Regions:
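Tandem repeat scaffolds
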Residues: 1-351
C-alpha cells in the first residue's frame, strides 16, 4: 500500500487492518479519524503527521518517528511505542491504555487532559512536558524523567515512581495517591495543595519544601526529613511519621490527628493552632516549639520532650503524660482536662 492509497482509504472511511507500513514515509500525512487494527508502523516516518481522533488497536511503532505528531483525542490500545520519539507531540485529550512507552522521548510534548491507563513508561523522557490535568492510573513510571514538567492538577494513582527525576518540575494541586516516592530527594521543591494520600514517602528528603495545604493523610513518612518546610494548613491525619524530622518547620494550623509521631523531632517548629488530637507522640521532641492554641486532646505524650515549648491555651485534655518532660514549658498557661467534656465523653445511656 502506498502513502496516497492509505490516505485515500482513510478518507473513504475504510478500516486499516493488519497492514504492514514498515519504513513508510508518512511525514505530514493527514491520517486523522482513521481506524487502525494491528497495523505495523515499524521504522515509519510520521513526523508532523495528523493523527487526530484516530483509533489504534495493537499498533506496532517500534523505531518510528512520531515527533511533532498531532494526536489530539487519539485513542490507542496496547500500542508498542517503546523507544519512539514523540518530541513536541500534541497529545491533548489522548487516551492510551496498556501502552508500552518504555524509553520513549516525549520531551516538550503536550499531554494536558490525556489519560495513560496501565501504561509502561519506564525510563521515558517527559522533560518539559505539559501534564496539566493528565491522568496516570496504575502506570509503571520507574526512572521516568519529569524534569521541568508541568504537573499542575495531574492525577497519579497507584503509580510506581522509583528512581523518577523531578528536577524543576512544577507541582500544584497534584493528586499523587498511593504512589511510591520512598528515599527520594525532593528538598526545596514546591508541592502546594498536593495530595499524597496513602503515599510511601518513607526516608524522603523534603527539607525546605513548600507543602502549604498539602495532604499526607494515611501516608508513610517514617524516617522522612521535613526540616524547615513550609506546611501551613497541611494535613497529616493518620500519617505514619515515626522518627521523622520536622525541625524548624512552619506548621501553623496543621492537622496531625491520629498521626503516629513516635520518636519524631519537631524541635523549634511553629505549630500555633495545630491539631494533634488522638495522635501518638511517644518520645517525640517538641523542644522550644511554639504550640500556642494547639489541641492535644487524647494524645499520647508519654516520654515526649516539651522542654521550653510555648503552651499558651494549649489543650491537654486527657493526655497521657507518663515520663513527659515539661521543663520550662509554661504548662501552667495550658488548658488541662475539661471536666464537662470528660463527663460528656464518659456518659453512657441507661439500659
Amino acid at each position: 500500500m502506498t502513502r496516497e492509497e492509505l490516505i485515500q482509504k482513510i478518507k473513504d472511511g475504510e478500516i486499516i487492518s493488519k497492514v504492514d507500513l514498515t519504513g513508510m514515509d508518512l511525514s505530514g500525512a493527514n491520517l486523522s479519524g482513521g481506524i487502525f487494527e494491528e497495523v505495523r508502523f515499524q521504522g515509519a516516518n510520521l513526523r508532523g503527521a495528523d493523527l487526530r481522533e484516530s483509533i489504534f488497536t495493537k499498533p506496532e511503532f517500534s523505531g518510528a518517528d512520531l515527533s511533532s505528531v498531532n494526536m489530539r483525542s487519539t485513542v490507542m490500545t496496547e500500542a508498542n511505542l517503546a523507544g519512539v520519539s514523540l518530541k513536541n507531540a500534541c497529545m491533548i485529550e489522548a487516551k492510551l491504555t496498556d501502552a508500552d512507552l518504555s524509553g520513549a522521548d516525549l520531551s516538550g510534548a503536550d499531554l494536558s487532559t490525556a489519560a495513560l491507563i496501565s501504561a509502561t513508561m519506564k525510563e521515558a523522557n517527559l522533560s518539559n512536558t505539559n501534564l496539566d490535568h493528565t491522568v496516570m492510573h496504575e502506570a509503571q513510571l520507574q526512572g521516568i524523567n519529569l524534569s521541568g514538567a508541568n504537573l499542575a492538577q495531574t492525577v497519579m494513582i497507584d503509580a510506581a515512581l522509583e528512581g523518577a527525576v523531578f528536577t524543576g518540575a512544577k507541582f500544584h494541586l497534584t493528586m499523587m495517591l498511593n504512589v511510591n516516592l520512598s528515599g527520594m530527594d525532593l528538598s526545596g521543591m514546591q508541592f502546594t495543595g498536593v495530595q499524597f494520600k496513602g503515599a510511601d514517602l518513607s526516608g524522603v528528603n523534603l527539607t525546605g519544601a513548600d507543602l502549604t495545604q498539602a495532604s499526607f493523610m494515611e501516608a508513610n513518612l517514617s524516617e522522612a526529613v521535613l526540616d524547615q518546610v513550609k506546611a501551613q494548613y497541611a494535613i497529616f491525619m493518620q500519617a505514619k511519621m515515626t522518627n521523622a524530622s520536622l525541625k524548624g518547620a512552619f506548621l501553623k494550623q496543621t492537622t496531625f490527628g491520629e498521626a503516629d509521631l513516635t520518636g519524631a523531632d519537631l524541635s523549634g517548629s511553629e505549630l500555633e493552632s495545630s491539631v494533634f488530637e488522638k495522635s501518638v507522640c511517644k518520645a517525640t521532641r517538641f523542644t522550644g516549639a511554639n504550640m500556642t492554641y494547639c489541641d492535644f486532646s487524647h494524645a499520647d505524650l508519654s516520654g515526649a520532650d516539651m522542654s521550653r515549648a510555648r503552651l499558651f491555651r494549649t489543650k491537654l485534655h486527657r493526655i497521657k503524660e507518663e515520663y513527659t518532660r515539661w521543663d520550662a514549658a509554661g504548662k501552667k498557661t495550658a488548658l488541662g482536662t475539661d471536666p464537662e467534656r470528660a463527663e460528656a465523653e464518659d456518659w453512657k445511656p441507661q439500659v
